[in-house]
Amino acid sequence: MFSAPLRRMMRVTKDEQIQPNSNAPENRKWFPRAPRPLRQFLDTLPRIGTAGSRSATLHVEDEQSPLGATLFDVATGASSINDRDTDASGLEPEKIRRFAWLRLIGTMGALMIAFGALGAGALPVVNNPYVDFPGGNFMSRMLQTSSMIVLIGVGFLVLAWVLMAPLVGIPFKRSGNRTASVSLSMLRRTFGAWVAPIMLTAPLFTQDIYSYLAQGSVTAQGMDAYAGGPLELLGPDNHLARSVPFIWAQSPSPYGPVALSIAASISVITNDSIVGGVLAHRIASLLGVVAAGWAITMLARRCRVSEEASFYLGVLNPLLILHLIGGIHNESILLGFLLVGLELGLRGTDRIQTGLWGPAWTYIALSGVLISCAGLVKVTGFIGLGFVGMALARAFHARGHRHVVAIGVAGLVQVAALVITVVVLSVITGISLGWITGQGGAATIRSWMSMTTNIGVISGFIGMNLGLGDHTAAMLVVTRAAGIAVAAAFMVRMLFATYRGHIHAVGGLGVATFVLVILFPVVHPWYMLWAIVPLASWANRLFFQLGVIAYSTAFSFFVLPRGLALPVGTVFSIYFGAALGFSILLLVGWWSLRRNPTFGLH
């Protein structure tokens, strides 16, 4: 009935899988002995603990899930079976009714966001097509009112999401129930209901989409998007170039050939239509999020974490819906490639451990290609190659290979996948390698969310007040470089922690990316999704989950719908009016529900 390798795997007992052997990476000292003076110096340094030991505490093992079943489930496909998706008859009617109301409240918020965006969204500078939408001409004349409607909608969307937390097993107090009361399919349908209205409206919270459209047109016309900015290449009369934010209008594209080839395809298909291009880019973003959602649930099963809680934090998150779908950022495509590649890579390592070499190499090759494609959207995607590589090296070592051989072979496999992917895509698309030298353009922005930027600006300010002159630019170079160096060192530490088994590859990737975002020269609210989305499928401590809820709730309101700065008085009136309107609607809704407590839908 089973193949010989599978029968051998099934004979492995639980104790044999749990007990580490003497040759395991974590049980052998494999670093060369340092010279005595160096050892004496190292002894004087503060102890920072074993690599990954603190980060690993974000994950709590579920004692009800036997480790011995893991390889069998993965190899036979049993881990893909989920009774909660096929049978919701055991769910409590009261909780189903409550969830249905929350879904409806969130959908109402999404509809308000979509309607308000017709006047408050990131509209094109010329030939605005959204005035022809129902209500668009009317809303476009009222920037402040439209912005209030969007923010009120964000309020209801966020409120519904936050109140769903206990229903997915994330209580607001430590003694609460950690078991999900709703099924994964219910959460997926909720995601569809919340995203559908936003798919059809104007861009939100950023003008970046016009850079994507312009760069796609540049690439489709056979020009090099790395040779100049959209304004230079398309000309000042081009309707796409005129809508690109001034700061990026003369900047080369920082994105890789995968992002540019997608944008070029959309340019050809839509004939540079703004409405068609926005919708097509949104569809691409949605496909990326859907792929990431599939991978999140697979990784959650692998890590023995609640799939419902993982999907709730990583996909249903309003920060993701508002900025990756509403704002149409390339991070959605990046995360789709990255997480699917991560799951396939770990499937390959599982099969190496069980001796299924043929399927293993197929999965590993696909993983390398997909993660390389993630890096060819934005270079931060390449980080995934390192963590899959260390998981692969760990699997090689478990088969009896020496440490140097295991790490060396795994590294060569990942480098080969990267090089082959870059060469093949460059040849097929005809896009140059300018993305390699085109990084760093975003560093011209002084982002208030960036710790290293803030330190540099404060240092320059102190220097000016001390009469030392304005050295802010020089200090920014120093502080930002120091931040990247620290993040790189921490990433190397997490890579070796992954190899030694102190932290799961998913956790190592998420924690390393979190530190990178904290120390990055430029940080936007949605950048934290680089870490939140992978960590959602591994980190199950209540502290982490509530932290994600708090961060996502707060930063869902930090960017105005138009994505541009407005006068202080205007900003105050928008937020004050939105808060007042939200409070009134909330009180009216609460009063209505109190009068009709049994009314509900599902």
Swiss-Prot record:
Enzyme nomenclature, EC number: 2.4.1.-
Null mutant phenotype: Cells lacking this gene are unable to synthesize lipoglycans (LM-A, LM-B and lipoarabinomannan (LAM)).
Keyword field: Cell wall biogenesis/degradation, Glycosyltransferase, Membrane, Transferase, Transmembrane, Transmembrane helix
Cell compartment(s), UniProt: Membrane
Membrane topology according to the record: Multi-pass membrane protein
Class of this enzyme: transferase
Gene Ontology CC terms: membrane
Keyword Membrane: yes
UniProt entry tagged with the keyword DNA repair: no
Positions of transmembrane segments: 105-125, 148-168, 190-210, 244-264, 274-294, 320-340, 368-388, 404-424, 448-468, 472-492, 503-523, 546-566, 571-591
Pathway it works in: Cell wall biogenesis; cell wall polysaccharide biosynthesis
InterPro entries linked to this entry: MptA/B-like
Gene Ontology biological-process entries: capsule polysaccharide biosynthetic process; cell wall organization
Gene Ontology MF terms: glycosyltransferase activity
Domain of life: Bacteria
Family listed: Belongs to the MptA/B family.
Function per UniProt: Involved in the initiation of core alpha-(1->6) mannan biosynthesis of lipomannan (LM-A) and multi-mannosylated polymer (LM-B), extending triacylatedphosphatidyl-myo-inositol dimannoside (Ac1PIM2) and mannosylated glycolipid, 1,2-di-O-C16/C18:1-(alpha-D-mannopyranosyl)-(1->4)-(alpha-D-glucopyranosyluronic acid)-(1->3)-glycerol (Man1GlcAGroAc2), respectively. Catalyzes the addition of alpha-(1->6)-mannose residue.
Protein name: Alpha-(1->6)-mannopyranosyltransferase B
Gene name, Swiss-Prot/TrEMBL: mptB
